[in-house]
Amino acid sequence: MDVGFTRSAVQTLSRSHCKNIKQKISQWEGRANGVTKTAKFHPKDFGVRYNCHQESPPHKRPTGEERNGALPRNTDVKSRDQSEDEGEGGECRGSHPSEAGLDSSLVCARVKQIEGCQAVAVGPEASLPPGNFYTSQIPWRSIDGLSPDKPLNLALAPCNSTGREPDLSVLDSSYGITKSLENIYYEPEGQECGPSINPLPKPRRTFRYLSESDGIPYKERNCDQKYCESISCVDPSLASSQDPEPKKYGGKIRGRSKRKSFEFEDIQHFRNSRKIHEELGRNAGSALYYTQSEDNIYEDIIYPAKENPYEDIPVQSFPVWRSPSAWRLPPAKSAFRTPKLPPKPQFFQRKTMELKNSQAYFRSKITKDTTLPVTLTEWKLFRAGEVANKKKRNLPPLVLKINDTFESKRGKKRVKLQPYTGKEAPSSKGETSGNESDAEYLPKNRHKRLAQLQPSSKRNPHYQTLERDLIELQEQQLFELFVVVSLQKKPAGYTPQVIQQFPSKGDHGYKQSKDTEERLKVIPRFCFPDSEDSAPTLELKSETFSFVLTGEDGSRWFGYCKKLLPEGRGKRLPEVYCMVSRLGCFNLFSKILDEVEKRREMSPALVYPFMRSVMEAPFPAPGRTITVKSYLPGAGDESIELCRPLDSRLEHVDFECLFKCLSVRHLIRVCASLLLERRVIFVANSLSTLSKCGHAVVATLYPFTWQHTYIPVLPVSMIDIVCSPTPFFIGILSCSLPHLQDLPIEEVLIVDLCADRFLQEVSDEDEILPPKLQAALVQILEDRDEVLAQEQQFSQEVTLSSLVSEAFVRFFVELVGHYSLNMTVTERGERVFQREPFRKSHTSRSVRHFLDLFMETQMFAGFVQDRELRQSGVKGLFEVRALQYLETIPESEPSGVNRILRSLGSKMKFLHKK
């Protein structure tokens, strides 16, 4: 009786794609017609019993070379034809591991032992041949010197055998499973044909396929030996009992070429992949490519048709001892979908309303956007959105009161919309158009002052604005330089000199720029502006003041000084501690100077560590607090908190000192002179009074910035600067007044802060500002005490600084708050300011004539240029109030014809009454 498979069985199994390894290997054994004739009569067994009654004559004893046969590293596998019409089916012609020639007596004993097992019918899962097919080459090298009578024991040793029966329990939980050392499925060359024998069972596989859902569950390490033995003897009828339809791909049976091994499935099923599936998507399926054909376990896995854009990227298999991580697994085919573009980053989305002509855009965005529209068309859409989503804003009561005051003083005259024709209309300086009943008048010397301002309107191209200064400061350090200045006696008198400096020139990593060296030469003179009148004294009241150094490029350095009398006995000369910084924050640096004074009284050596800790501190943002730690003898480690106010515009401003020195009407006249960039000189007896009043007046110009010479305290030795024909704002001590009277000075406004009077004036300061707006501003400032008393009952946050700031901001909103309606956008995306439509949009002639003068100043040019160059909206206090002001402007104004008809109607009513 032939124990091999018949030709018909071979053809049947060649078309069968079994769902388990037993059928798979049985099919492969039956098709092997490329093996020798003797191999056909060998029962190819993977632990499956085909014919237990066949006698097995002894084999020839193999040679030592055959006995030491080893598995080759690479297996050459040929692909079979995919057609079903081929007779024998594709065979494996690759080199199989050579048989090692076991002793026939030992083999026969083992065969009889296996034949004694009863045939047990088990399910598909139990009939799986055990063991995977990966092993190390190391055990093969260790059997060279062993006697030929122990090969069976060696074969069973990796399975923890105790003698007769192989113990396969260890295979259930091990990673690397050792294969039998002798391959019995290959006939060595020259071996005689003989009766077939039953070979040793292969180790049981330690994994299940994903398609086998009804198999026996995975057993633990301590499974009993009977269960393991029952797997080794299986009814051969099960090999062909299940013949499912062959799996096809693309209408053809899949070939065997270019297929990867089952290593993917080993890893995928042995490691719990549920967590990976959840990460890659519930419906993503398996992330590893596994076989869809089960013809041969030694075939390479072929990939299905690639349906993703990454088809050229090969998938690398993972070693058996490594578990693939979720983020390295390739996504499944179902996971690939049409990619969606990411959302547009916020910094690419224009927050202003440029080039936006969709009314729906404004209706959806206007409630969140506090920037200003930039064109007239956009403003109309902006208004439509506001009407659709009209909500009453919760303005502070102080702001509402200020707005009511201006509206009551201004009357019905508001800004009207001027259509843009595409050409800049010539400026008509002497126009008298407007409401004939307007009681406003034109000052006599307006045209004369305009002629004087025009030649000097573009003297400095380096425009500076407050917003730009604040942005540049964010990348600076807290201060640039700290010096201690003292007076040194010389034959001509006392001369100020620097006696201590930090950082010093010798400090490592400190490189002093040329600009710093030039400014360092003049700093001592600003620290002691009255050095000629100084003398040793027993007592001196310390005072704090500041000065400003303006560079050729328009940059400014603030000097914060503290003048005091050093410790000692007898008459002593005063000293000045000076900190130079780009940040304008008077209160913050005053606190630092107080700490310096405390340490210098103990020892001058304590100043350096403290100043170094301050310089290394981060630059504080508005409203933020930084902590500086330092050591103080007797007190230990100290922490000093330095805080910047939230409103950075007013952090170096003291309006109380200003109102103590000047009345409201004098203050308005000084501000009007500065708006037209005239020359102004403050005179006072105290250094602190000069610096505080000077900073306060400059702060009232917001949102504009003084662009010219600004020296809060001018040294006597530099008094010649007042002869300059350019605009300036300078403060001098009263002791320098005699020197000032001897100098040839052009038109200048000299203000005595101590006496609250004008020493010299142009005599037209009251006629500069529009009278109605000026009256509203004066009323608010004069009633400041009453307003503050009422507002502080409801909110403690209302201060004098906030009241003065809001009043002046409202004044400028009435004048130029509609500037954004006259910004046009060119084809290149550049903003261009339309000057003439901007000026003509005011219905008041006094406002238009003031704008004739003010629009020629460098302050206004810097303001416009800053708005033209900015790509994002400016969100300062002025912009917020201007937006609220634009909401109150009516959408349409009566045309010129309507005004004529309305005036005729009023005249007819007047005649009818007569």
From Swiss-Prot:
User: What are the residue boundaries of the cDENN domain, all occurrences included?
Assistant: 649-782
Biased composition range(s): Basic and acidic residues: 56-68
**InterPro entries noted in UniProt:** cDENN_dom, dDENN_dom, DENN_C, DENN_domain_containing_2, Tripartite_DENN, uDENN_dom
Which GO molecular function, any one, fits this protein according to its record?
A: guanyl-nucleotide exchange factor activity
Region forming the signal peptide:
none
Q: Indicate the segments forming the uDENN domain, all copies.
A: 480-627
Q: Phosphoserine occurs at which residues?
A: 261
Q: Does the keyword Phosphoprotein apply?
A: yes
Q: Which residues form the dDENN domain?
A: 784-874
Q: Does the keyword Phosphoprotein apply?
A: yes
What job does this protein perform? Guanine nucleotide exchange factor (GEF) which may activate RAB9A and RAB9B. Promotes the exchange of GDP to GTP, converting inactive GDP-bound Rab proteins into their active GTP-bound form.
Q: This protein is called what?
A: DENN domain-containing protein 2C
Highest lineage ranks of the organism? Eukaryota, Metazoa, Chordata, Craniata, Vertebrata
Q: Name the gene for this chain.
A: Dennd2c
